[in-house]
Structures are given as structure tokens and as C-alpha cells.
């Protein structure tokens, strides 16, 4: 048995060892912290910021580093990179300014936390990216995954499943035949809008945004579910779900780019997705059940088409819900946003509004209502819509980015697999080297002279491709453009649009999922046609 003295000595020795261990632990933690900060600062010094520094440092270690392959771009801040570029409601403008500053309009690199990003403000490089099979995939953000969009056309990985969805949608929803079949519903909805606008007092400003969003939602519900949706009864619940989805998908989620934040959900986006998805499931599942209980041999609408698929094309119920939810979600925003921008420009430029209305009166007259077949004879109105798409593209960054699935070369620079690629269509459409007087509203630039080919905005010319290009081009581009043309023509044929006061029109913008007017457009209406 140890003596009292021995026990005291052992205790003293253990105490010293304990103190020594604590000191070593503290020293080790301090050393690790210093090394971590030093590495972070070192990686941050590379062009493009920390994510690019990490990649380039790895190539330097492996001996494959080449100075000429470095893509210029902002460093941003240590660890987070240039998150501030994308956190802004004017991200497209900030990115354009950064590209100008770094002389990198053709190709610029920047970091979103640990995510490598390239962006181009050049139409030739944009075509190279969008038409390359290497960029056939999209980066799936946590919000998109949580909202089930990874199983729908927009975010599904490029492959057999994606091609199946694309083919089904193209044949049964977005084909020329289906667009023509849906003409009646668009006319009915346009008549409802006219009736609503007629009831507005000519002495009070009319705010058309909510009407356009409601009409767009109704139109999409008709296209997808084959019958008029009772908006008066249920539109509040559905509008709230769609608006919440827009907000979630349009918000830069820090945990997508800073994995060490994922456990904390600092922006509460995951929590909000978890609240929204059960509501969406219940809503869409109820409609699917109603269709299953209906009798009939031939598919009547898009839901019936999806339910009738068999063999390798057959979709599970969760996949059907994801596809239908995306159709509702994506089809209700762009049309409303774009028409509001067009009407704002018509209020701001009454002389051009008169030109459009004179064209309508010559083609349609005032004795009858507009018909969709009249649209082909309205070149100036078509030019107005294209010019608004140029100045105010709803998706200035083409909404959703692309993902490099392998190492590739873009504009002579090496772009590694896993890099996110973006096209700043707003910067392209405002570039004085691409467009004459790019800040001026000049619809006549799109009026084809005799012998000229009409300028297409449907993806073939990357000077203006608001619907994208290549494999991931928007499948509903023709339907969307037709709807915008018809409803805009109807509103300008039936009403004269004027400013609500003497303060002009506020053209300030806000980028969410789409780039919309920061404040709803107020206008005073005067009936043109009795």
C-alpha cells in the first residue's frame, strides 16, 4: 500500500501531467487553427477565390498547373468567396460589373464558398457552353432537391429518365398541335381579364400584377389538368404554395456552398421546404386520385397522359407529383412577369403604344375581338415583345445554371468537372459591342426589313436567348411566347394604358427566381373597344 508521501508525489505528478496535457491540447488547437487560416488565406489569393485556389493548388501539387489556363475573376473573401455577388437582388448587374472590372466578359471565374463557378457575358462563349454535351446537367440545390424538382424536367440528371420526361412533355403539352388545342382556354381567360379590367375605375390606378399571376396560374392548371381551376375558391392556397416555392428556389442557400453550415440550416430554408412539400403532396395527390376515379378510355389531359404510361415510361406516383408540381410552378411566373414589363414600357412610351394599337386596328379592327391567328400579322407588336425580352429578360442568368460532368475546354481555358457554369443573358443583351444603343428601348431593331430573316429569340441566336439554348432549353418556350403575345395584344387592343400620376414609371427591378418589377405597375385604363 502506498504511503501518504508516495500518494502525494503521485498526485503531484498526475497533476503536472494533466497540466501538460491541457497545455499541449491548447497549443495543438491553436496550431491547427493557424494552419487552417493560413491555408484558407493562401487558397483565397488565387484568381477566382478559394474554391478555385483549392483546385489550382491541387494541380500545382500534381505538377499539371499551367498559368495560361487560369481564368480571371474576383477573389471575394476567405472561405465564402464571392457569395455577395449572388446574394443581391441585382446579381446579374453585379456579375456584369465584376466581369467588366476584371476584363473577363468572355469568361470569369468566382467562388461561391466551396463551389467553383464560371460565367460568361459573351454570346459566342454562351453558345459554346449551352450547346456542349459536357454541360447537359444542372447543379441540384438543396431546395430544388427538397421540393422534388430533381425528379422533374428542370433538374433531373441528363439521361434516359430525363429524355423520357422531355419527350412526354414535348408531345403532350408543348407541341404545336397541343398549343393550338389550348387556344380556346387562353381566349376564355383573356375575356375574363378584360371583364375584370372593365370593372376598374378609370379614376383609380389599376395594379395588374395579381390579375396576371392569377390568369397565368389558371392557364397552366387548364393545360395540365384539362379543366378550369376554381380560382375563386382555392387560388389563395395554391398561390401561397407557388409563391413560397419561388422564394425558396430563388434564394441563394449558403449550405449548398458551405457544407459545414448544413447542420444548422441558418436561413431556415430546409425547415420551410419541409413545411411546403406535404402541402404540395396533398394538393397534387388529390387531383391524381380524382383522375384515377374518372372513367374513359382516351387521355383527356396531361395528368391522364402520365397515368396511362406503361413499360419503361411508367412513372411512380412521387415522380408524377414532381412533374406536375414543376409544370404548375414554372408555367405561372414568366408569363406574368414579362407582360407586366411590356405594359410598363407601353405606359412609358405612349407613342410606341399608339403604333401597336394602330397595327391592331388595321389587322383586327375595332368591330371584333382579337384572335390568335391575327398574331402572325403583327410584326411591330412582336418586335416590342422581343425588345422587352432584351431589356428585361425574366431569367437574366438563364434562371438555372449548368454543371460540367467532365473536364472540358471553354474559350481555350480548362474547366474542371463539377464546375457550375452560368450565362449572364442580361449582360449580353446590354452589351454595346453586341447591340447598338443597348440602353434605349427601340423595338424597330427587331422589325425585319424586306429580304431579311426575322430575329429568333427561341435559342438559335445567343445574342438574345431568354429561353436558353441547347439540350436544356425551356421546353415550354413556344407556349409561353404565344401566351404573352396573345394576352398583350388583347390588353392593348381593348384598353389604352396611361400613367397613374405624373411621376412616370418605376423600372427598378428585383431578381427572385425571375427578374420582376421591384414595385407593381400602377396604370390608368381607358376602354378603346366597346
From Swiss-Prot:
Positions bound to heme: 474
Gene3D superfamilies to which the protein is assigned, alphabetical: Cytochrome P450 (1.10.630.10)
Cofactor needs: heme
Protein location: Membrane
Alphabetized GO MF terms: heme binding; iron ion binding; monooxygenase activity; oxidoreductase activity, acting on paired donors, with incorporation or reduction of molecular oxygen
SUPFAM superfamilies: Cytochrome P450 (SSF48264)
Tissue specificity statement from the Swiss-Prot or TrEMBL entry: Expressed in leaves, sepals, petals, stamens, carpels and developing ovules.
GO cellular component: membrane
One Pfam family from the record: p450
Disulfide-bond pairs as recorded: none
Principal cellular location given in the protein's record: membrane
InterPro entries hit by this protein: Cyt_P450, Cyt_P450_CS, Cyt_P450_E_grp-I, Cyt_P450_sf, Cytochrome_P450_78A
Keyword Ribosomal protein: no
Keyword Heme (UniProt): yes
Enzyme class: oxidoreductase
Segments crossing the lipid bilayer: 25-45
Domain of life: Eukaryota
Keywords per UniProt: Developmental protein, Growth regulation, Heme, Iron, Membrane, Metal-binding, Monooxygenase, Oxidoreductase, Transmembrane, Transmembrane helix
Note: The gain of function mutants eod3-1D (T-DNA tagging) show increased size of leaves, flowers and seeds, but defects in reproductive development.
Name of the molecule in the record: Cytochrome P450 78A6
Organism: Arabidopsis thaliana (Mouse-ear cress)
Amino acid at each position: 500500500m502506498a504511503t501518504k508521501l508516495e500518494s502525494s508525489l503521485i498526485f503531484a505528478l498526475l497533476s503536472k501531467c494533466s497540466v501538460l496535457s491541457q497545455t499541449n491540447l491548447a497549443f495543438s488547437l491553436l496550431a491547427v487553427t493557424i494552419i487552417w487560416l493560413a491555408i484558407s488565406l493562401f487558397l483565397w489569393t488565387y484568381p477566382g477565390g478559394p474554391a478555385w485556389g483549392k483546385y489550382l493548388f491541387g494541380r500545382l501539387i500534381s505538377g499539371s498547373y499551367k498559368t495560361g489556363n487560369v481564368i480571371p475573376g474576383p477573389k471575394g473573401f476567405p472561405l465564402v468567396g464571392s457569395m455577395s455577388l449572388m446574394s443581391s437582388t441585382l446579381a446579374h448587374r453585379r456579375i456584369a460589373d465584376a466581369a467588366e472590372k476584371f476584363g473577363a466578359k468572355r469568361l470569369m471565374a468566382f467562388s461561391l464558398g466551396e463551389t467553383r463557378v464560371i460565367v460568361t457575358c459573351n454570346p459566342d462563349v454562351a453558345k459554346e457552353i449551352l450547346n456542349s454535351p459536357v454541360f447537359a446537367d444542372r447543379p441540384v440545390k438543396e431546395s430544388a432537391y427538397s421540393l422534388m424538382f430533381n425528379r422533374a424536367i428542370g433538374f433531373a440528371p441528363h439521361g434516359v429518365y430525363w429524355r423520357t420526361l422531355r419527350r412526354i412533355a414535348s408531345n403532350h403539352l408543348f407541341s404545336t398541335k397541343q398549343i393550338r388545342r389550348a387556344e380556346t382556354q387562353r381566349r376564355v381567360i383573356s375575356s375574363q381579364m378584360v371583364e375584370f379590367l372593365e370593372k376598374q375605375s378609370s379614376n383609380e390606378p389599376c395594379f395588374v400584377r395579381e390579375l396576371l399571376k392569377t390568369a397565368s396560374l389558371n392557364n397552366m392548371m387548364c393545360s395540365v389538368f384539362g379543366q378550369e381551376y376554381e380560382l375563386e375558391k382555392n387560388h389563395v392556397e395554391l398561390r401561397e404554395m407557388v409563391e413560397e416555392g419561388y422564394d425558396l428556389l430563388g434564394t441563394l442557400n449558403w449550405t449548398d456552398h458551405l457544407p459545414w453550415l448544413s447542420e444548422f440550416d441558418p436561413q431556415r430554408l430546409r425547415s420551410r421546404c419541409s413545411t411546403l412539400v406535404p402541402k404540395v403532396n396533398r394538393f397534387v395527390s388529390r387531383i391524381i386520385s380524382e383522375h384515377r376515379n374518372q372513367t374513359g378510355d382516351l387521355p383527356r389531359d396531361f395528368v391522364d397522359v402520365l397515368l396511362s404510361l406503361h413499360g419503361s415510361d411508367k412513372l411512380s406516383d412521387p415522380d408524377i407529383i414532381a412533374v406536375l408540381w414543376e409544370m404548375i410552378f414554372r408555367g405561372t411566373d414568366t408569363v406574368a412577369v414579362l407582360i407586366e414589363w411590356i405594359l410598363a414600357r407601353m405606359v412609358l412610351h405612349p407613342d410606341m403604344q399608339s403604333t401597336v394599337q394602330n397595327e391592331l386596328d388595321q389587322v383586327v379592327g375595332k368591330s371584333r375581338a382579337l384572335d390568335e391567328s391575327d398574331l402572325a400579322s403583327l410584326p411591330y407588336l412582336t418586335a416590342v415583345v422581343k425588345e422587352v425580352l432584351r431589356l428585361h429578360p425574366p431569367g437574366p442568368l438563364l434562371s438555372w445554371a449548368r454543371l460540367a460532368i467532365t473536364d472540358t475546354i471553354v474559350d481555350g481555358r480548362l474547366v474542371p468537372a463539377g464546375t457550375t457554369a452560368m450565362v449572364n443573358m442580361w449582360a449580353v443583351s446590354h452589351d454595346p459591342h453586341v447591340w447598338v444603343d443597348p440602353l434605349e428601348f427601340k423595338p424597330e431593331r427587331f422589325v425585319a426589313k424586306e429580304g431579311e430573316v426575322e430575329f429568333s429569340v427561341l435559342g438559335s441566336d445567343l445574342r438574345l436567348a431568354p429561353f436558353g439554348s441547347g439540350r436544356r432549353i425551356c421546353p415550354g418556350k413556344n407556349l409561353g411566347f404565344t401566351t404573352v403575345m396573345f394576352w398583350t395584344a388583347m390588353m392593348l387592343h381593348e384598353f389604352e394604358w396611361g400613367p397613374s400620376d405624373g411621376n412616370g414609371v418605376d423600372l427598378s427591378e428585383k431578381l427572385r427566381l425571375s427578374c420582376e418589377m421591384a414595385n407593381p405597375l400602377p396604370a390608368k385604363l381607358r376602354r378603346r373597344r366597346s
